[in-house]
Amino acid sequence: MTLTEYLKTFIGRPYIWGGNGTGKTAHGFDCSGLVLEGLWAFGLYTGADTTAQGLYDHLTKTATWKEGNVDNAHDGDILFFGKSLSKITHVAVALGDGLMLEAGGGGSACKTAATSTGFVRIRPIRKDVVACVYLKK
């Protein structure tokens, strides 16, 4: 099973701000919680729960991850979104063919996305993607 195959098993789970699939948030995820769930499951990240910005900062400082081309994202690449590399507000996983898997929806701000329309879903890659990080082979 690949990272994206594993994360697809969570499609339809609700968006819960601060959710990482455990404890009080066992039934849902926020954007970083979903990506972290996959990275933890495959032993690709051993750190604590963090934000999208914190995950980007961590991964780009390790020798096992490399920055890629945001216009050519491949299945399993980690995508980061925001106004700049120092103002990242969202994270998702690329599926290839211009699609991504994310926990989000329901509003433009993280806290307001926790509505009946916020969930884990597949959608086209957003235009505000600022970075793409992939696992070195």
What name fits each language-model region?
Residues 1-60, 74-75, 82-90, 101-103, ...:
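N-terminal capping segments
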Residues 94-98:
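Short acidic-glycine loop/turn motifs at beta-strand connectors
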Residues 103-123:
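Catalytic alpha/beta core of large soluble enzyme barrels
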Residues 63-74:
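Short acidic low-complexity segments
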Residues 2-3, 66-68, 116-122:
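Intrinsically disordered, low-complexity boundary segments flanking structured domains
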Residues 116-137:
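Active-site or metal-binding loop neighborhoods of secreted/extracellular toxin and effector enzymes
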